[in-house]
Amino acid sequence: MKKQILALVCGVIFSSSTWAHNLQLEQSLPSVKVSEYGEIVLSGKDTVFQPWGSAELAGKVRVVHHLAGRTAAKEXNQSMIDVIKASHFNPVKYQTTTIINADDAIVGTGMFVKNGAKKGKQENPHSQVVLDDKSAVKNAWGLNSKDSAIIVLDKTGKVKFVKEGKLSDSDIQTVISLVNGLTK
């Protein structure tokens, strides 16, 4: 009996990794709105926040980078972001959307996360940057805490690729090939 209980407990603990995202290929992302903070937009040299919703993702091919407000999460897929920048995709057909989960930041670093998000928008004005202070996106999409996710959407908003955690070199090539094909 003890072995059965131990097996059950271990099964529950180790199967938690299978409780990952609820995103499905060829489907739209689950609807979500971020009303507190939200999308960072430029207003002259300043930045302002406006409400954002996932319905805004349709219309362009996108790489959506959702990440916890932690340095480790940002660094996990920085090589993917660097390759995207170097690819110089047509901004009429393509846009990167970065969603930063400020609710999933190390205690006491919230202001740094917010300021970093604003700076990121100023440095990449053509990108869409969203600051989520309530984990709304993470919860709606079932994403892991303390992590990074890369999602490729076609111009209708359908998921073409999704992976949580660090992308391999092969994953990065897959993403770039997908975006190239979808933007032709």
Swiss-Prot record:
Compartments, as annotated in UniProt: Periplasm
Q: Name one GO cellular component term.
A: periplasmic space
Q: Which family does it belong to?
A: To E.coli YtfJ.
NCBIfam families documented for this protein: ytfJ_HI0045
Q: Which residues form the signal peptide?
A: 1-20
Cited InterPro entries:
YtfJ_HI0045
Sorted alphabetically, the keyword list is:
Periplasm, Signal
Tell me yes or no: is Signal among this UniProt entry's keywords.
yes
Chief place where the protein resides: periplasm
Q: What is this protein called?
A: Uncharacterized protein HI_0045
